[in-house]
């Protein structure tokens, strides 16, 4: 008779859920106050005018308007602002 011994247990077989980070509203898009613009880890993007920053560095609109991306400053930082339509 053919016999097969029990296979050993494995230490694999786990995976974490995706964090769903990234830009949610792109340049030129209309947003309402409270809309999330970017979900990020750290400050890849910085808050400009009419944009708030949450404790997890999520950027969100403080007023209604259009999203505007800009690069400025000596360190070429990326800022996101909301401009009135």
From Swiss-Prot:
A GO cellular component annotation in the UniProt record: cytosolic large ribosomal subunit
The domain of life for this entry's organism is Bacteria
Q: Which GO terms describe its molecular function?
A: structural constituent of ribosome
Q: Where is this region: Disordered?
A: 1-21
Gene3D superfamilies associated with the record: 2.40.50.100
**Chain segments annotated as coiled-coil in the UniProt record:** none
Gene Ontology BP terms: translation
Per UniProt, which keywords does this protein have? Ribonucleoprotein, Ribosomal protein
Bias type Polar residues, positions: 9-19
Say which family it is in.
Answer: Belongs to the bacterial ribosomal protein bL27 family.
- Provide the protein name: Large ribosomal subunit protein bL27
Species, as recorded = Pectobacterium carotovorum subsp. carotovorum (strain PC1)
* Top-level taxonomy: Bacteria, Pseudomonadati, Pseudomonadota, Gammaproteobacteria, Enterobacterales
């Amino acid at each position: 008779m053919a016999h097969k011994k029990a296979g050993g247990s494995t230490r694999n077989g786990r995976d974490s859920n995706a964090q769903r980070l990234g830009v949610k509203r792109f340049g030129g898009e209309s947003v309402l106050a409270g809309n999330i613009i970017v979900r990020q880890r750290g400050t890849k993007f910085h808050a400009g005018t009419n944009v708030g920053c949450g404790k997890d560095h999520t950027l969100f609109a403080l007023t209604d308007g259009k999203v505007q991306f800009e690069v400025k400053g000596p360190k070429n930082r990326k800022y996101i602002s909301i401009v009135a339509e």
